[in-house]
């Protein structure tokens, strides 16, 4: 289910195709409006350019047990630079394609979606898609913190080539996905004629029993099954609420998983400018060669955070989708106001220790330990489409053996604009 293609060429073709559709537009007049970028629409069709620029600064001060392990890093980096298009051919078919450069690496795709809506409640989607996780489904443009922490690293899957069915009611939804690997991954190419890529199934259901103008309550449950096929074994490796890495691994099981099953819960409550949110995943891992290596372990990961808007805004919860969307700034600088300010504190937790405890033969050292971290966040929005962020993280990994523990003090800044 993997596709290798030129991002630039693909984007150009996509834009040309979408523009040709817009010109046709069934010979109807097209209305124009500005929604962060030019948008053209009539009763049946819509076309819009989209994109984002996220520029980060990261400073890490890392202390490691034992000699020669301490270091400091300081980097400016392009977190995301994306361009794309989205639109609607008619009342039944829609599309989205967006990609660009992430973390200073080569070009790759993010959202690439074809959607078919047979009616208002049902959507059938095909492409590079996320299926579960409250913070995961919330765009990086709108997450309260700069990055999603260990939960986003291995507690839930990011974009995967998938076939997804969704049903949405007024305050509930159900999602089911059949999944492969990312659209950016190379095809599996083993010598065996029967070689195959990873396979996954994900189901999610959410319910918002409270959904008033000032109060929102979100609860959700999801289940994920994965089989690695002939790809590399699943590894459970996390970072310190950042997308930055200098190559140092603070905590990991290494590649151990042949298959796994994940049960996850989500919760969030919004009361005016105050909100609280958390998620937790319990991952049952089936080892490779368990008879030789050891029993099957459980991996646990979760987070919780609290946020508050002193300027009076509230987080924009979509009760039908079970996701958070773009916040509406009450007094943007474009209207002579001061913009919006959000303050937040977050706790992250990951426990990989069972991957070590269940080994038949235990090595003297292992990074399959525990991680805990606290993050303070400040978000300033001059408008709903521009954001400046500051995050400070104090994290600790408690691993096995000498010279394996880390204390991480991390400061990050971000300037962000999207359209």
Predicted regions and their residues:
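Domain-scale selection of a single, long terminal region
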Residues: 2-9, 197-205, 211-230, 254-275, ...
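Outer membrane beta-barrel
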Residues: 36-66, 70-229, 299-335, 340-357
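Short solvent-exposed loop/turn micro-motifs enriched in small/polar/acidic residues
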Residues: 31-33, 106-107, 156-158, 258-260, ...
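Cleaved targeting-peptide boundary
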Residues: 27-34, 64
């Amino acid at each position: 289910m993997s596709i290798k293609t030129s991002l630039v060429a693909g984007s150009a073709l996509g834009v040309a195709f979408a523009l040709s559709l817009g010109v046709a537009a069934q010979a109807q007049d097209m209305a124009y409006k500005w929604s962060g970028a030019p948008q053209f629409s009539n009763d049946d069709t819509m076309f819009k350019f989209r994109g984002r620029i996220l520029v980060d600064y990261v400073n890490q001060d890392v202390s490691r047990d034992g000699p020669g392990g301490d270091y400091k890093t300081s980097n400016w980096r392009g977190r995301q630079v994306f361009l794309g298009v989205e639109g609607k051919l008619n009342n039944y078919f829609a599309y989205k394609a967006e990609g660009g450069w992430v973390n200073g690496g080569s070009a790759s795709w993010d959202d690439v979606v074809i959607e078919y809506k047979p009616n208002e409640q049902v959507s059938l989607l095909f492409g590079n898609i996320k299926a579960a996780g409250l913070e995961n489904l919330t765009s990086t443009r709108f997450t309260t913190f700069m990055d999603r922490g260990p939960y986003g690293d291995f507690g839930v899957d990011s974009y995967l080539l998938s076939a997804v069915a969704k049903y949405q009611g007024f305050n509930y939804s159900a999602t089911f996905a059949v999944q492969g690997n990312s659209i950016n991954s190379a095809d599996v190419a083993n010598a065996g004629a029967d070689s195959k890529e990873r396979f996954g199934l994900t189901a999610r259901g959410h319910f918002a029993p409270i959904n008033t103008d000032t109060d929102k309550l979100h609860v959700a449950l999801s289940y994920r099954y994965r089989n690695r096929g002939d790809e590399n074994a699943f590894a459970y490796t996390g970072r310190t609420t950042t997308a930055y890495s200098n190559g140092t691994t603070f905590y990991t099981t290494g590649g151990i998983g042949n298959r796994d099953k994940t049960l996850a819960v989500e919760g969030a409550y919004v009361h005016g400018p105050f909100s609280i949110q958390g998620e937790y995943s319990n991952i049952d891992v089936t080892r490779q060669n368990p008879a030789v290596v050891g029993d099957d372990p459980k991996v646990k990961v979760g987070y919780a955070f609290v946020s508050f808007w002193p300027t009076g805004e509230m987080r924009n919860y979509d009760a039908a989708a079970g996701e958070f969307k773009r916040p509406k700034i009450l007094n943007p600088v474009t209207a002579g106001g001061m913009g919006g300010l959000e303050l937040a504190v977050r706790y992250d937790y990951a426990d990989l220790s069972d991957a070590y405890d269940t080994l038949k033969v235990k090595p003297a050292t292992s990074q399959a330990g525990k991680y805990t971290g606290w993050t303070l966040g400040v978000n300033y929005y001059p408008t709903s489409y521009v954001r400046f962020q500051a995050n400070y993280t104090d994290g600790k990994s408690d691993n096995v053996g000498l010279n394996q523990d880390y204390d991480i003090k991390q400061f990050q800044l971000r300037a962000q604009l999207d359209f």
